């Protein structure tokens, strides 16, 4: 177990943010969707081992390109490992198992596009924010096929009576149940 890991993650994030690394990564992986993993020099004689859980199923954050795990979160894992002077071991879990793995001590931390909800905060500690999350609602095009000529929605109450799809148990599922 790595002592003061949350503090170390937050120190790393603050430094990476100040240097512009997080913005560059977000621009490359998310905004431009280029999906290019840079070479990251890992330590030859690490001081510790960092076991990180991720999902491997959410592009552009953590996904497989053929048999190679890649993405924003994966790059972040390796950058943090290099900063920490650690050997990195990545373990893949689905969303149902990843928090349980952290609680059981199978992994030291999670880097997996995971929203910090009050329910999750009861079970695990969260670092400072890694990147901003922007949410939008997609609507079906109108009968004439033109999305611009359809109904206009300006507030959540405008969606009353509409049908939605959201990840069951996710942060937006809860929001929809509370608001609409």
Indicate residue ranges for each PLM-predicted region.
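Alpha-helical elements of the RecA-like P-loop NTPase motor core of helicases
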Residues: 7, 24, 100, 173-174
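N-terminal hydrophobic or amphipathic helices and topogenic motifs
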Residues: 4-89
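Short, solvent-exposed loop/turn elements at domain surfaces
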Residues: 4-7, 59-64, 119, 145-148, ...
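Short loop->beta-strand "edge-of-pocket" segments that line small-molecule binding or catalytic clefts
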Residues: 46-56, 152-173
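Short intrinsically disordered, low-complexity coil segments enriched in acidic
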Residues: 1-9, 113, 163-166
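Helix-loop-beta element that forms the nucleotide-linked donor phosphate-binding surface
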Residues: 180
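Acidic, polar ligand-binding/catalytic clefts
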Residues: 1, 43, 74, 78, ...
